[in-house]
Amino acid sequence: MRLLALVLLLLCAPLRAWTYSLRYGIPESAQVWSILVHLLGDVDNQLLTNLYPLVTGLDDEIDIQENLVALTSNVLRERYDKEDVADLLELYASLYPMGMIQHDISSNAEQDDANSSYFVLNGNRYEKPDDVFYLKSKDLTIQQKVPDVDVIQPYDVVIGTNSEAPILILYGCPTVIDSDFEEFNRNLFMEAMNGEGKFRFIWRSTCSLDGKSVEYPLTHPLEITLQNGSRMSSIPQLKKILYTVPKEILVGADNDDQLHDLEPEELRELDLRVTSLISEFYQYKKDITATLNFTKSIVNNFPLISKQLIKVSSVNKDIITSNEELNSKGFDYNMLGLYINGQNWKITSLTPYNLLTALKTEYQSLLKITNLLQELEPSKCILDSKFLLNKFSQFSLGKLQNLQPIKMDLHTIPGFSESVIYFNDIESDPQYDELVNSVQAFFDKSKFGELPEIKQNWSEIIFVIDFARLEDSEVKEALGGLVRAVNVVSQGYPQRVGLLPFSSDSDKSVVNKIYELKNSTDNLTELKSFLETMLLADGLSANAKHSKHIPVPDVFHLLDELQIDETSIIINGEIYPFRKNAWNYLIAKVIKKDTEFIRKELSNSSPKNKQISVRDLLHYKSANLRHNKYTPNYFADSVYSSVNNTALESVCSERIGYYTKNEEYNLLHTITLVDDFGSIHALKRLRNLLHTSFVGVRIRIIHVGDISDIWYQLRGSLSQKDPIGSINTFIDALKLKKVKSHTYKKSGLNQLGLHKWLPDIPLFELQKGSFIALNGRFIHLDQNEVPETEHFEAIIKREALRTIDSVFALDLLFPGFSQEIINPDLIEMISSILTRLFYQGTHIYNNGIDYTTESSLPRMDLSEFFRPNNLTMFEDGKSASIDLLLILDPLEERTQMILSLVEQFRPLKFVNIQVILMPTLELNIVPIRRIYVDDADIVKSITSEDSRSDPEVDIEMDVPNSFIVDNNYRIKKLLIELHSFSSKTVLSTGNIDGMGGVCLALVDSAGNIIDKTTTMKTFGYGQFHTDKFLKGCYIKSCDSRYTVQSFSTDGHPDFIPSDSLDILSYNPQKIAVKISEEPTHEEEYEEGRNNDTIINIFTILESGPDEEERYMQMILSILSKCPETQKVNFFILDQPFISDTLRKSCEYINSSDEMRGNVIFLNYEWPQWLRPQRFSSRRRDVSRFLFLDVLLPQNISKVLYMSPTEVPLDPFDIFQFQGLKRAPLGLFRMSGDGYWKEGYWEKMLRENNLEFYSTEPAFLVNLERFRELDAGDKYRIHYQRISTDAMSLVNIGQDLVNNLQLEVPIRFLKGSYKKKLVINDECVSEWKKKINKFASSPGDEDVPGESVSSKYQDSDNAAPLHDEL
């Protein structure tokens, strides 16, 4: 019977495997296993081993009909008491149908082998399942000698009972195509798990996403926007939506089918009324889940029930009091949003994928801390870890606010004071005689605003100006700013102003002249006059020639030390690139911050009447060395990893050495140098490190090269009091090549052990050479890079701050902790985890610097402020490791998304949901205009093919920014964002200007171009789109002026270039690209730009079939009159609502030689850094101008924008207009009376002698001139600046271009260009019949007369559209 059972099991096993669903071609077993490895790989390998037979279909008790995710979750809960892992598994499986593909696994399996199974032993490949039973003992013995660390890769799980047995590798994917996988797997498992355990094995899945379409159906929430006057009956599913509204609110609802905005008096207290209603509900139910559902049902359906809300609710005055109490504690509307243990998440980053990853990362990090705390006291639990994190956040918050960007005490740098030319001295100049020399001035009201009336040189602004670049507008503005500042301080303004002049070219005559005038005896009067004249004149070469060649300070060396290579401004020791739009703001910000810091320090430590040096107080923590790599401006620019010192055992103890200078002090800081110490560079690095003067520092070295006599001698020398002499001897011997050394191991260190030690650093980065690690801070070293001792000291000084904060926090958890002997391994690990959580808590994907204009808040300890009052503050009330705090204004559209998002994560038992309601006391605008539908069944109903809504209703699916959705609400493409910078630019959070106007291409592993983009200047932003998952792709330049020097998915100041990119999941992709300028091939670059035979027409459609019909009519009308010598390109912005019918119609046109036209769909998504535009119609309107420079191919020099009309203007006539030389835009003047003739507009236009222009029905653009003026960047920055006001830009596209005429001029088009095109009706009618027939035919029907070269060409590949281009 047992034999029969085994036979049946073997026969049924393949069936069991194939019953699992395939998603993107990935079997469910592979999906579930990859997720489990992702969740448990660093936590519980034994549990993974136990689950392996269940997941891969080897468990005899498995129900072959049961869903594998549900089955595995039940087993986790019932058999292993792993509720947390079970909940996370279900969430990951629902969001990642492809599983969690690990990017840094080197499979060793060829792509051609993806559909076959085999295993590898000793490098030999075995392709028959029965080969498992005939393995030779000799082969197993040879494999057994290979250390496990040389075999096991990240995310590998070793299956087998005998820990001494050799390891085999199984390759395969359990699909129908790979029919042998089940037998391979079963045979290996049986042999590995039997009593003897001849071997162990690892399964490395060959299931691949590479090249598979990303298309997938979605059921994300829908945003249904209804305008005032819309009829409820326009949405057939509205009755289903209303079922989600509480019945008590719908009581008394009238039968008025039409929606109306509320009157101002009805709006005023409505937010308070709704908050009162929610509060009353919670007080009755005492159930936060029910309360959140109740709140969501109101907020999501607000446009439908606003009238009823007025009738059913009244205002609880206690809520106003609660608001006031929150305000007194520092809470305001800028804090609205979602917080994970006090870590704020930007609203644009809130997606199910990001929130799930953030919760999992937070939870597992706290578990790691808990394990470490239990080494000190076994009774400690995960709540103690949360307490520790909160206290660390308290201590670190000040560091984040005051120590970035890095502040320099510049006067400690040799030569600085002698090089700066100061124009005033507050301590001695007569205009400051009325000031007082007492710090009490910081607490008194000042007539100078933030600057106190104190007679000290504590605050200074230094203009660093490149006088070789005065033609640059930024440099000119800097000089003008200096001249104005000098005039202001001469009137008694108490701020020191200085100049640090330099010249970036070989001509130093102007700089020499400036220093000559500095040394004159006229109290700088002549120098001031010289600078004023220079500002007004075109050049001063004549004046500068008379400069005497007197000795001048070595400014070039000084600026090299400060790493300044462009015109900059130094504000109280903080160095910023000078930008004319930002420098005044920066001065105000820094002075306000520093004044508050000094006031706080004086309050804590010093009597107010005491005379002290304010400057010394300001700079007592300042640096005296600036290095963008070792001590970057911002903590976010650094790379941090958690540290797992227990993994160092696998690295091999004989490769590790330690040195401590003084053991009298606790060793809080461990700096590790990982290097090949058989090289001169490595020994020099170590020598410089050993020269550091700090105590309390442990030095660890890890040798990655061959094990030899030199290494043993070096490691032995570390036990000496002063090993530097021995190291110098080794260096001298290596230089003279007199080293005789026996090599014991001719192999380098396997970096996999290092990856386990620093798990947040990608494996490929650890394999790229030497590096430094300091309590989790990671610094890669180039091959010949040798940091000086002062660099090591600067790194230690900077990073020590966070370690000391860790000790302070531990002191609160373990009183007296810092007074006892501290285990350096423990503090290294705990401080590294706390650092990563606090300083980079939102860097969950390790995808580099987040370039954004959106403000974000640091992690804060909000636990002390959250006090449930059952009125506006309530929570689950359970003790959980994660507090998920929602600070909400009930009547705000963001609240819809947050509540719907959080509902998905309520099953997580380790999450405690907290709510703070902060209603607007007086509403004056309609707060919510959209219905938010998150019920999956209703979403499916609305989005189904046979249940479309009225076209006048705007329906959008709320998907992550990286998802591009089609008209069937399926993922159509994935968005990949990039930021391009000059190879000379050091990447930093402070970077704003990138490389704009550069064409870049995304290329797959076979060399095929997937997509092209043109970059913006702001953040160097660009975007690619892919409709396939990709492995091994890369980025290259498609612009002959530039070359891609390097790129990385983890962009930071010292990033290690990636060899390739993998796009294998839904996680957001952000790529940093470094670009170098190549010699300009002007003729090659300009070729084909101007072609008079091609007319380019650009259009952005509104939604609805009527608009599409007008557009098609316009195309056919224009083509019916197209001369035989010309062709017309119709560019259209691709949008989700565009129908398949229109796409097929365009396909026909592109295939017709008769029509001489081409319709090109352009892809461009709203950039994440740009302030979102809520209403889609306004988004489309302003996009006509915001993205012109990056949306259209670079080889297009002239384009006509036309709104869809059945009888269009004559584009052939307008295109002949030659007046766009200085001005890039040609628009028709606005006629009649309107808002532009009153108020702000009337005044602005009159004072600047400007006209007001209309953007309808067409406008002409000289794209070459548009790009020369950086018009696109100017429009985007102007939009970003003024769109903070919800009432600005009422007619958004039209108002934007009219408002910026002084920077982007407009030329008027004569009224005669408004003449209508005379249409060939007969031709249009005939074409329509053919198109309609083709559009209604099956999708695979060929177009009559279609040739290979004329097939429809999508714009994903922005290649030239015609040979003429």
Curated annotation (Swiss-Prot):
Translocase recorded as keyword: no
Keywords, in A-Z order: Cell wall biogenesis/degradation, Endoplasmic reticulum, Glycoprotein, Signal
Pfam families from the UniProt entry: Glyco_transf_24 (PF18404), Thioredoxin_13 (PF18401), Thioredoxin_14 (PF18402)
Residues bearing carbohydrate: N115, N228, N293, N457, N519, N523, N644, N870, N1091, N1150, N1195
Polar residues bias: start-end ranges: 1347-1356
Keyword Disulfide bond: no
Principal localisation: endoplasmic reticulum
Protein localization: Endoplasmic reticulum lumen
Region (Disordered): 1334-1365
Any Gene Ontology biological process: fungal-type cell wall beta-glucan biosynthetic process
Signal peptide limits: 1-17
Gene Ontology MF terms in the entry: UDP-glucose:glycoprotein glucosyltransferase activity; unfolded protein binding
Motif (Prevents secretion from ER): 1362-1365
Entry GO CC: endoplasmic reticulum; endoplasmic reticulum lumen
Matches recorded under PANTHER family: UDP-GLUCOSE GLYCOPROTEIN:GLUCOSYLTRANSFERASE, UDP-GLUCOSE:GLYCOPROTEIN GLUCOSYLTRANSFERASE
Family: To D.melanogaster UGGG.
Other remarks in the entry: Present with 815 molecules/cell in log phase SD medium.
Role this protein plays: Required for (1->6)-beta-D-glucan synthesis and normal cell growth.
Protein name: Killer toxin-resistance protein 5
Organism: Saccharomyces cerevisiae (strain ATCC 204508 / S288c) (Baker's yeast)
Lineage: Eukaryota, Fungi, Dikarya, Ascomycota, Saccharomycotina
